């Protein structure tokens, strides 16, 4: 990565200043808009736990981003987002943030599956030529891929059901109060979170396209 940095810098120097500034300005706007979408998700998720204004939800997202930069594998993001909640709701907020992350992961898997379907002819040929895989093995691979994505979709829809079952398990019984906010999540909210996550993914995609144009 460091070896490619001089090449990247030299390529930036060949771009007219006005064009580069315009691209960077648009990229910055997209980033702010993306955080706004995530703030909307957080506002909707915490509504029954602790109603937040959009401004407070946006501040929570920025706090989560700041904490995640100083943590390993961004694990501090959930903690950072919950820091602006009241004392009794912070741990519940951390649990809720995993639902937001699950909705984003769901969309990422779906778009990945769409990419596999779109690239199927060339991907299928490359796997056959380079890895010498038989048709049976490839069929099993594609079948497992579809199955796992489908299973994740079902698990996402059933998050309230699993939370309810876990809260009654002996080991999790003492932590049942943390799962209470998830048990009552309506399915339409889970769908709404997935749709907003899809919009975030499209914004990410546009940002990458703009970067490739630099």
Functional labels for PLM-detected ranges:
Residues 81-85, 103-106, 116-123:
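Short alpha-helical linear motifs
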Residues 58-84:
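Extended non-transmembrane interhelical loops and adjacent amphipathic helices
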Residues 54-59, 88-102:
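Membrane-interface alpha-helices at helix entry/exit sites of multi-pass transporters
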Residues 1-61, 118-214:
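Predominantly cytoplasmic-facing regulatory/coupling regions of multi-pass membrane proteins
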Residues 35, 39, 69, 73, ...:
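Transmembrane alpha-helical segments of multi-pass membrane transport proteins and ion-pumping complexes
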Residues 63-71, 95-117:
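Membrane-embedded alpha-helical segments of transport systems
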Residues 41, 62-63, 75-79, 90, ...:
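Generic hydrophobic, aliphatic-rich segments that mediate packing or membrane embedding
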Residues 46-52, 77-91:
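Transmembrane-helix boundary and interhelical linker motifs in polytopic inner-membrane proteins
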